[in-house]
Amino acid sequence: MRIFSDRHSRGKAAACAALPGERPCDCKPPCTQQTDNTFLTRFFRNKRGNLAIIFALSLMPLSAAAGAAIDLNRAFIVQQRLERALDAAGLAVGSAPAASDAEMKAMAQSFFDANYNDEEMGVPGELVLAAANGRVTLSATAELPTTIMKIIGYDKLTVGSEIEVVRESKALEVAMVLDNTGSMAWNGKIGALRTAAEDLVSILFGDQDTPDLLTMSLVPFVTAVNIKTPGFDMNWMDVDGNSEFHGENFDPNRGPTNHFELFDGINNASWKGCVEMRPEPYDTLDTAPTLGNADTLFVPYFWPDEPDNGSGYNNNYANDRIGGNKNKRQSNGGKYMNRNVSVDETPSSTEGPNKACARPLVPLTNSKSTLINEVRAMEPWYNSGTNIAEGLAWGWRVLSPGAPFSEGASFGNPDVQKALILLTDGNNEIVSQSTHNDSDYTSFGYVGTGRLGTTNRGTARNIIDQKVAEMCTRVKADGVRIYTITFQLNSSSLAEIFRNCATEPELYFDSPSNEELRRVFQSIAFDLSNLRIAR
């Protein structure tokens, strides 16, 4: 779609608008028109509106001109609101290339009304829509009763605006990679995120339930991501336990070390679907899982039962059944065999081998209802920490044309625009433990095992930061447009990482409040719609 208007350059459109009940953001200055067929009116109708108004005012006595400027300024404001509302309507129509004329008119009117408040100055007339040869023209006028200009015979001004939309069949694929860690439970943040993400889905889908040219994915993350969702394939998994770090927390002399076998031994729990990070270099690559290379396969997340009668541990859910030091008791795989354990998988505080494992991701889908239902179901999950790198990795993978999840079009396809939205409310974080583990269990195991090349939590955080930066570069190299959002976060270092991660500096957003987050998501939604503008 391409939008033209009297004040926009070709191909440009407003990047923000609002849903019903929200106050939209400001747009650019307008021009005005006046209804009476007079010399002054001809200048009002001049598309170079500001010059016309200045010249017209010069013809009046100074006092009358000063008074008329008040009415003309009010007309400017009305023009802004008309143009903003038409932009929103135009973006909605342009993103629905399969809609009929009647459907377009209803859709455009709905978005126009939502963006032109009844309480605002000016009474808008009917929205006029004309469609031909793939082009849609939208126009509207509003009448504004005058105040000072009544004295010189002008009772009202009619302000008009018009845009042209070229509808195009360019597809859009969007991955929302959203922080669902425990800190999102504070200050109403998870509720604000649900609302903002639902706004984005609603704006992009408009009135269409299953559009042909739009698919979206949702990737909630903690330190791990849950991939057990429709389309999941066990061929992606390290079933035989051969990956480099599979079973590193268990003693092979005291029972199974394969995480699938450990789950099989528990009578009242099964693998929920979270996976560990792959070993380097595959942790930051989109390499497809291959049965002949175990390190490309994914290891099921299994938080070990931590020792009985020990302080500082966050997940003690089974009887140790043996004596010895804490490491010996924790690494005993035999205690899971044919046993019932204490399990609680209800967020936010959980217990058991799936502790801190969020809801499954949603692969690319064109189902509006599926996305909205899963957005509304997001919850914060305590413990483990925050691993932005793992969330980003899975956002990249769901957009990829290859396994795991192959719904995405090929990278570089000129008929498809791919985008990724990455949000966090915290730094890459590892929950500490004053224990032999040095941390909570995470998607890269315990810090104390040294899987990241260090047993120091601070150094481990820096390494994860580096992995985020590496992946941002690779994702952008695949032609994916990245938007980044920090939410109620006071961290200059992460802000810099996210600013550099975004495709352009202006696509990084800092949202210090719940209200601002909603405005950010709406702005992103309209920018995403603009990606489908013919240029």
Which residue stretches match the model-derived regions?
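N-terminal polybasic/positive-inside topogenic patches
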Residues: 17-23
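Soluble periplasmic/extracytoplasmic beta-strand elements of cell-envelope proteins
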Residues: 92-94, 137-139, 160-166, 173-177, ...
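Low-complexity, S/T/G/P-rich flexible repeat/linker segments used as non-globular hinges
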Residues: 2-4, 16, 27, 31, ...
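Alpha-helical assembly-interface signal, strongest on the long, hydrophobic N-terminal helix that forms
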Residues: 2-10, 25-105, 182-185, 482, ...
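Extended low-complexity, polyampholyte segments enriched in Ser/Thr/Pro and acidic residues
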Residues: 101-166
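Solvent-exposed loop/turn segments at secondary-structure junctions
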Residues: 142-145, 169, 180-185, 222-226, ...
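Von Willebrand factor A/integrin I-like adhesion domains
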Residues: 112-118, 471-535
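Divalent-cation-coordinating short motifs within acidic/hydroxyl- or histidine-rich contexts, strongest
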Residues: 2-3, 98-102, 172, 182-402, ...
